[in-house]
């Protein structure tokens, strides 16, 4: 999605693609090309089962982030984007009870609080490393996406799982956890649009990417199944991985430069029609 958007702007693009089996670490260790702009989107990640079940695998992200930041400084790349995550926010702020919006200032890199699992620690460390790279002259935008989704998302994530269940017309409709946990959903096209708008505005530092709207998994299931034209019974699995209870952004910084356009309902319709 990002590649397509940049290509549409006429950029000359070089990709280091992990999916092809290449070792991105080797690229950052040995390549000395100076680019005008660099994006770091790569990470070992997956759904909740992957984050909880493979902490050492996810920890590999630390090496990737470190070599990327060193490469930025070594090559003198003047402008860069680091995709962090909402998982970097302290889990203590994402507990049951009233929904608390997460502000960029809730992460203090001088006094770091417990983030969400190894994945959150890796992203938090990546943000710390970005600060060191900035001190060496590279201006870095740190994007903190919340619950990104889209029509072509990997099926290990909740959104495509819900879409597939609705396409099969599952009844009962299975939901991991109580169904009351909330997430802040933002479509991949809006994530891409927001990132480029922030770059155009020459923004640096951390920016939340989200709508600022709390949607429970029960509500997501109802939206998806209503769009699919049926109303199943919801079946909750308390034994399945659940993650934090609430994760919702305060998107004020983003909204100064970009307003998302694809509602969750529209995103669901697109996915069901794919």
Where are the regions a protein language model picked out?
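NAD(P)H-binding glycine-rich loop region in Rossmannoid oxidoreductase-like domains
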Residues: 27-62
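Canonical Rossmann dinucleotide-binding motif of NAD(H)/NADP(H)-dependent dehydrogenases/reductases
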Residues: 1-11
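Conserved Rossmann-fold NAD(P)-dependent oxidoreductase catalytic core, especially the SDR/UDP-sugar
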Residues: 66-116, 141
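C-terminal substrate-binding subdomain of Rossmann-fold SDR/epimerase-dehydratase oxidoreductases
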Residues: 167-274
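Adenosine-cofactor binding site in Rossmann-like domains, unifying the SAM/SAH pocket
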Residues: 11-30
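SDR active-site strand-loop-helix element
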Residues: 16, 38-44, 80-86, 143-145
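NAD(P)-dependent short-chain dehydrogenase/reductase
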Residues: 92-101, 124, 128-184, 188-199, ...
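Active-site helix of classical SDR
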Residues: 118, 122
């Amino acid at each position: 999605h990002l590649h397509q958007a940049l290509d549409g702007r006429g950029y000359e693009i070089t990709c280091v693609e992990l999916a092809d089996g290449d070792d991105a670490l080797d690229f950052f260790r040995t390549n000395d090309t100076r680019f005008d702009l660099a994006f770091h989107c790569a990470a070992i990640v997956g759904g909740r089962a992957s984050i909880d079940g493979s902490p050492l695998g996810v920890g590999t992200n630390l090496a990737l982030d470190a070599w990327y930041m060193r490469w930025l400084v070594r090559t003198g790349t003047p402008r860069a984007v680091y995709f962090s995550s909402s998982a970097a926010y302290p889990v203590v702020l994402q507990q049951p009870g009233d929904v608390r919006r997460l502000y960029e200032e809730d992460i203090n890199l001088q006094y770091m609080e417990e983030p969400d699992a190894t994945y959150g620690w890796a992203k938090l460390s990546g943000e710390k490393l970005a600060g060191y790279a900035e001190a060496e002259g590279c201006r870095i935008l740190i994007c903190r996406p919340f619950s990104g989704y889209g029509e072509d998302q990997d099926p290990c994530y909740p959104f495509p799982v819900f879409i597939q269940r609705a396409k099969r017309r599952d009844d009962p409709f299975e939901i991991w956890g109580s169904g009351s946990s909330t997430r802040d959903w933002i479509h991949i096209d809006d994530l891409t649009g927001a990132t480029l708008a922030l770059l155009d505005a020459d923004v640096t530092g951390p920016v939340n990417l989200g709508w600022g709207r709390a949607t429970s998994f029960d509500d997501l299931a109802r939206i998806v199944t209503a769009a699919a034209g049926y109303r199943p019974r919801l079946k909750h699995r308390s034994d399945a991985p659940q993650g934090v209870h609430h994760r919702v952004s305060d998107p004020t910084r983003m909204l100064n430069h970009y307003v998302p356009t694809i509602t969750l309902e529209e995103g669901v319709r697109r996915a069901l029609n794919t």
